Amino acid sequence: MKEAMDKFCKSRDNGLFLLDMTTGSGKTFNVLEFIAENYNKEEYKDSKFFFITNLKKNLPFDELRKHFSKRGNAGDFDKLCMQIDANADVLIHRLQSVYTAYQEDIPKHIIQSPEFKALLNSVQLLNKQKRNPIEGKEESASAFYKYIENDIRDKKEPAFRKLLIAELNSFKTPGKKLKAIANEKKYQWIGELYPAVFTREKRIYFLSMDKFFLGNTTLIEPQYLFYTHKIIENAVIFIDEFDSTKSRLLQQIIKVGCEHKINSIDLFTKIHSPLKLKEFPLDLTTDSHSTRQYLEQNSGAKTCAANLEDLEKAFSKTHDNFSMQYSFRTREESTKDKSRNFLFQDLQFHSIFSGDKSFMQVKVDHKAKQNWLEFTQEKPEKEDAELISLLSAVKARISYFQYTSGTLARNYMQLKEERKKEREDDFTIENAVASVLNEFHLDKDYTQYLLPLVLSGQSLGKRKKDHQNNLQEKENLRSFERSVYERGFRYYFFEDDLNHNLNSQIYFYDFQNSPEKVLLHMAKKAKVIGISATASLDTVLGNYDLEYLQRMLQAEYYEMDEADQKRLERHFEGLIEGYQKLKIHTEAISYKENFMDNLKEIFSNPHIIQEYTEKLENSFSKENKYAAVSFLRVIKALKKFVYNENLRSFLCLNNKLAQEDKASFDLKLIKEFATEILKEAKMAGKKLLPKAGEDLIFCLRTEGYEQSNAELKERLSKGEKIFVLSSYNTIGVGQNLQYKVPENLEVVKINQYAQEEKDFDGIYLEAPTHLIVNLDMNNSISEEDMVKFIFQDEFLMERGELSRIDGLALIKEAFRNLSGGLGRFSKKNIPHDCPSLHNYAIKNLLQAVGRICRTGLKNKEIHVYVDEDISENTI
């Protein structure tokens, strides 16, 4: 594995390399060895290293320290390596101890500030409650913790950070700020609370995918996005559990997009006004030496001043064409329900209007000094009269502004670089873009919306000259790319309110980013190595679109040669050589048509069968057959575990978690069944069984996972027989469930890497469901779920697994569902049999089985039970 990674890094300046490495194959160990062996070699001396994974708790930062230490390089580890966490997480963990240690050094005006006091009070309250939890109130306590943490993350920490940034502004450059934090007593505590200030001093970084996408806030320079920043140029980036990071990126893209509710007309006006009226600083339009060289070599290119002038002309033309000096207002009689009207735009516009109206037109009323918005049944005769024409023009101008801002910013950065004095800090593209946008005095929300879009368009950065032409070809390829990955989508909606009664607000949510686009940014600047058991599994729902990435990266999409493939195959064969010593049993668990017939397979006592038939009939209605089937299959797996004296640990994975008194999957009822099964098993002579279902059943849920998992491992290490109930989402990718081998337990060593921990003895797998967002005809979905559904729908249309007609029909249904149009949805168009959905289910099953394949020590018997629906159709 190390040889394959080294060959990729030495043969490419940038690109993407996917490594399919099975769970338990030592992939993390090999990555850490690679970093520790190569960081100080001549060929890697200019490279930074990144290790990225979904779960922050799975970052092997302390393990890397051991790899450095065994080579005598512990000092280098402290000097060069850092784990970058969210600022709020660090503050929650450190603020109290740092305040105690540095209380005499922290300036009094900081300690006495409202921002510091509010933050300290919240952190103290949170930590006190966590240290002294109230027994039996775990669920309400968890909700309280989450509320306080979100308040710190969203309000208290940003306010305190703003205070510190203002404090450090007395030092004019990032370098001087960093020097003060490192050396001046009254500022050293800042480095303890915000270790990210030292990012530029390090070379090896460990961070979650969330942090990588959302960006780095260092206090000493503008916040930047890792994937567009020069920090990753020529870097080696390892992405652990590669395919699963797509869902994490998608989640953050959706969350960020839904946070920016953009008033399209207002944003246009706020950009147009300074373009028309303001005299911009001369430095903004002074061409840099690099720009002048480009102008000499390209006859059609324009100066910065000409670009700014063209931008003003384009905005003014649109402003005049649509009489934008007047407000836009919905004519009340044209629609009864304005809250249920949307315009969706991907490759083209699609209207989702209430009632029988299919079009929306704009009528200019010069007498009333008003632009009237009217819903109509007929398409307007003049194209310019359509609202779609207005919105298209406005969005095109905003995109033009993004492009021109990026061009001006890059020129300004080059100008600053050319004028830089000795020992002066670099002026970054982030500095330049922020400076350009600041000239337009935009609202904070507009700036936060535009900044990453402008930076994303400027992420090419400084590259080696001999690769510039090749990269330009890639950029040209992207400019013709019309896929959802590159262009994204957006949707518009309309709001009328008494507080803005003279005009209607036309808002949009914009999703121009995609996980594939982020990955392309990375692979254009760095050497990206994606590692997972299912890294190259072909599913656009559970993995990146590999066909698209290959098409866009071309030669930079690296595939290992035959020698490396054979070497990895031999390594894998060595890992599984001892499996022949095991007895592996697989079985599908079925369901019979009525409760009584199923219960006869579970119990032998006719009175118990009758009693529990009645309980099931009371718990499950005829309409809820799926829940009953799911429940009874779990009970059948439970019985098989109880009656097998060779099994001590069992993992039962379902689509949802069992909860007490939850009719569809009642934990209390499961424990009742367990108690009765234990009674009959003991009567049948089975030994070493728990007293009751309460002792046998262990529910592992997301809330309080770490504490529960530690308790579970301790009990299993003592030899207790435990049936663990959990869900696919809870266990997830990368969760470690192995536990220390109990005393006097006979285990089988399957390879030379076995240590002191063993895997579970058995597993039950329910057929994965809800892999696509569920559009329930009886319940509205959230805004974020609807956007996720649209992304999934667009991904499938992109690959040709769903027709445009069916896909757009589903998207329209999703909008109706969001706005409360329930009871109309038809599932006939949902692509249940498409390859991506099929492979997504396979991926979930492979990752689930991987939870019991992490170590070299196994029970002599391994039992794998599956929902019979998996046998029939995989999903």
Residue ranges and their predicted role:
Residues 47-62, 627, 634-669:
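Conserved strand-helix element at the start of the C-terminal RecA-like helicase core
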Residues 1-13, 32, 512-520:
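Pre-Walker A adenine-sensing motif
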Residues 16, 35-60, 233-235, 645:
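Conserved SF1/SF2 helicase motif Ia
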Residues 12-34:
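Walker A/P-loop
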Residues 188-203, 676-725, 737-740:
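Conserved motor-coupling elements within RecA-like helicase/translocase cores
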Residues 10-19, 45-49, 201-203, 526-527, ...:
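Pre-Walker A (Motif I) flank of P-loop NTPase domains
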Residues 54-203, 285, 289-350, 357-369, ...:
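A substrate-engagement module of RecA-like helicase motors
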Residues 33-40, 63-64, 182-203, 207-444, ...:
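Signature of the SF2 helicase/ATPase Hel1-core->accessory helical subdomain module
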